[in-house]
Amino acid sequence: MLFVLTGEVQTGKTRWLGRLAARLAAEGVRCAGVLAPGVWRPRAEGAALSAEDLHAGGRAEGAFEKLGIDNVLLPCGERIPFARRADLARAAGAFDCASQSARAGLGWAIDDAAIARVNAHFRELATEAGAAAEGGEAKVPGESGFGAVPSDPSQAVLRPFAVSLLVVDELGRLELVRGEGLIEAMALLDRGPTPAFPHALVVVREDLLPIARERLAPAWGVLRSIRPDEEGVDQVRAALGV
């Protein structure tokens, strides 16, 4: 089963997914892939958002503003600075006009080296999937075993589990429109259900949902859309048999 977690920007999808991963681990389901938590700071009183901030998905209300995005690799917990708001990168002289995100006109300045690191992680997960399909012993990269994901998924120490869930947070315009970004995650998803990863959950913004369905349905069949709420938790747990 392929679940698509969707909703508008800044509706708590990643926080919901992190809590779900912790709960599933406690119930015997291993989550492997990537989470994309935001980097935030308190908003100055009366401060307005820039055009770049709004383009990046910021909102004019709220006590915090989003400065960037990290990636947390699951299950090892490695945390990678992944993206910075484009206007902040320009102001710091760190904006790379040749980067994938710049060429795509995104509101985030995404580090191509960070993309490469996440892709390497998914290549290793694909190797695990291949070993499992051939009847070999599948192990997650860098881990001797798997264990329960605590409330902070970045602190995971994992032990063997009977069921695995592939997690991709998130698929955006780079992946779904331009064929760039997390290409190794897309390649793994294109395999459909495998012995190592019979189920997957991807995060996709609502405006990209039709493209995601067209792209992934051939491998997975019907995609099940869920929201970051208790009903979504129940649907995932039911499909996983927990």
Task: Give the ranges of each region predicted by the language model.
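Hydrophobic anchor at the beta1->P-loop junction of P-loop NTPases
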Residues: 5
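The conserved Walker
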Residues: 9
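Conserved lysine of the Walker
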Residues: 13
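Intrinsically disordered, low-complexity terminal tails and inter-domain linkers enriched
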Residues: 42-62, 120-164, 193-195
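Phosphate-binding/switch loop-helix module in NTP-utilizing enzymes
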Residues: 91-130, 162-166, 171
